[in-house]
Curated annotation (Swiss-Prot):
Function description: This protein is located at the 30S-50S ribosomal subunit interface and may play a role in the structure and function of the aminoacyl-tRNA binding site.
Organism: Mycoplasma mobile (strain ATCC 43663 / 163K / NCTC 11711) (Mesomycoplasma mobile)
NCBIfam families: rplS_bact
Keyword Ribosomal protein attached: yes
GO cellular component, one term: cytosolic large ribosomal subunit
Disulfide bonds: none
Pfam family, one: Ribosomal_L19
Biological-process GO terms, alphabetical: translation
Record has Ribonucleoprotein as a keyword: yes
Gene designation: rplS
Name assigned to this protein: Large ribosomal subunit protein bL19
SUPFAM superfamilies in UniProt: Translation proteins SH3-like domain
Family according to the record: Belongs to the bacterial ribosomal protein bL19 family.
Protein keywords: Ribonucleoprotein, Ribosomal protein
GO terms of molecular function: structural constituent of ribosome
Amino acid sequence: MQNKLLDIVENDQLRNDLPEFKSGDNIKVLVRIKEGAKERIQAFEGLVIAIKNYSTHKTFTVRKISNSVGVERTFPLNSPVIVSIEVLRKNKVRRSKLYYMRDLKGKSARLKELKK
């Protein structure tokens, strides 16, 4: 009984407007940021290095290099602060978690683009 009620509530909060993406894809995430009374939209563009699946609590981690410093940010997929997600490039990878990309620099950190 309890699980059915939770499923109904969680299914109402699912988002269907986001595109399909997987680990290894380059994406741009537009995030709504509220600072005091002001609200703005900030873009975070980078490589998806991990997707963690747990029903409606799905999260994904995006990594980018900013001023030669690696920055990682984890987003809940069904979060209302995410305005949109745009897939910029699909890459060919053979792993679901790309944590080894943290140690790579320069040309060794490149991934092959998936051919259509």
